[in-house]
Amino acid sequence: MKKTMSAITAAAAVTSCFTGFGAASFSAPAKAAAQTNTLSENTNQSAAELVKNLYNTAYKGEMPQQAQGLTINKSTKGDVHAAFGEPERPVGGDNRFDLYHWNMGQPGYGFSYHKDMTISEIRYFGTGVERQLNLGGVTPEVLQKQLGPVNRVLTVPFTDEIDYVYDTGRYELHFVIGTDQTADHVNLKAK
C-alpha cells in the first residue's frame, strides 16, 4: 500500500509540473515578461513626459524641477548658488560648469556663465537612481515621437555622441545621445 501511494504521489507531482496544476508551475516566465512590458511602458511614458517638460521649459530659457526659475542670460551665478548652494565641482581648469551631482533621486545640473556671470548654458544630467525612468529612457525614437523632426543633428567632437538639436524660440535644446542610444545629458543655451 505504501508503494502504491508513493507511486501515485510521484505521478501526481510529475503531472502537475507539466500541466501547470499543483505546486509546480511554469508561470514565472510569463510573470517576468509581464513585468518587463510594464517597466518598458513606464519607461516610455516617463521618458516622454520628461522630454515634453524639458522642451516646454526651454522656451522660457529654463530647465525643469530644481532649476526652474533660473534663466539663461538673466539669472546669475549668485542666483544659482542661492538655489543650489556651493557646487560640488566648481568652474575651474578644463571644467567650465558649476556641477551639482544627482542624489536621493534628484537630478544633477551644470551651469556655465558669461563674463558678466549670467547663465550662458544649463546642463541637465538626470537622475542616477532608476535612470531608465529618466534620461536613460530618452532615445532618438522617443524624441521623434514626442517632438517631431529634429532641427539639426551634430556630432560631438572627440566622442561617439550625437547631438539632437531642437529650436525652442530664442533657445536651443540639445539632447546628447550616447553610444547606447540613450540620452547622456541635455544642454540648453541661447541661439
Curated annotation (Swiss-Prot):
Which range is the signal sequence, renumbered to this chain?
1-23
Record carries keyword Signal: yes
> Is Signal found in the keyword set?
yes
Xref: Pfam families? DUF4309
The organism sits in which domain of life? Bacteria
Keywords in alphabetical order: Signal
Transmembrane ranges? none
Protein name (database record): Uncharacterized protein YjgB
Q: Which organism is it from?
A: Bacillus subtilis (strain 168)
